[in-house]
Design a protein with these regions (language model features):
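Hydrophobic ligand-binding cavity/cleft-lining segments
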Residues: 1-50
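Glycine-rich portal/gate segments that line the openings of hydrophobic small-molecule binding cavities
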Residues: 40-87, 107, 144-149
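Short, surface-exposed coil-to-beta transition loops
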Residues: 5-7, 65-69, 91-95
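Hydrophobic pocket/interface hotspot
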Residues: 19-23, 29, 55-57, 72, ...
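Beta-strand/loop substructures that line and gate deep hydrophobic ligand-binding cavities in soluble
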Residues: 82-133
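Beta-strand elements of well-folded, non-transmembrane domains
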Residues: 12-14, 61-63, 89, 114-116
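A non-catalytic, amphipathic alpha-helix used as a structural packing/dimerization or gating element
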Residues: 133-141
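Generic structural detector for well-ordered beta-strands
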Residues: 9-13, 40, 58, 71, ...
Length: 150
């Protein structure tokens, strides 16, 4: 199974002790996900992040409703966490979120290893562009959210 890699970095003008807690709240993912995906966290509150935590979502990809379940496999506040898809739209989705203090703010890095259903052809036709578009939206929202905070 061929894996594909996606990486993104974003510097936020806020300290890590303010940025990481935002990511610690699973429901904030709804705010960071483009509206066209109709993303919804299904796991009841409160969601306490820890290794082994399972989180269920509902999402629409190209109009097709999909349930997605991830597991938090690494939880190391305030430095990093890793979520891995157990069921959902991918054969593999392994997402490492890293937070580093830099230049008076926080460098947020996303490293994703993934393998879409349909393999390289689907990645080339749809998936890569979708992932890039989703992360661009996410970065724009994060800049809006953390630029407003005082």
């Amino acid at each position: 199974m061929k894996e594909f890699l996606f990486n993104a970095e974003l510097w936020l003008p806020r300290p890590r002790d303010e940025v990481f807690p935002f990511f610690s709240e699973a429901r904030n993912l709804e705010e960071l996900t483009p509206p066209w995906l109709k993303f919804e966290v299904l796991t009841p509150a409160p969601i306490v992040m820890r290794p082994g935590l399972l989180i269920d979502y509902r999402i629409k990809i190209h109009g097709i409703p999909i349930r997605w379940r991830t597991e938090i496999v690494v939880w190391e506040p305030p430095h990093q966490f890793v979520d891995q898809q157990l069921s959902g739209p991918y054969n593999l989705w392994h997402h490492t979120h890293t937070f580093t203090e830099r230049d008076g703010g926080t460098l947020c890095r996303d490293d994703v290893r993934y393998h879409p259903r349909g393999g390289a052809l689907m990645n080339w036709l749809f998936v890569r562009a979708d992932v890039e578009r989703i992360f661009r939206y996410r970065q724009e929202r994060l800049l809006q959210i953390f630029s407003k905070r005082t």
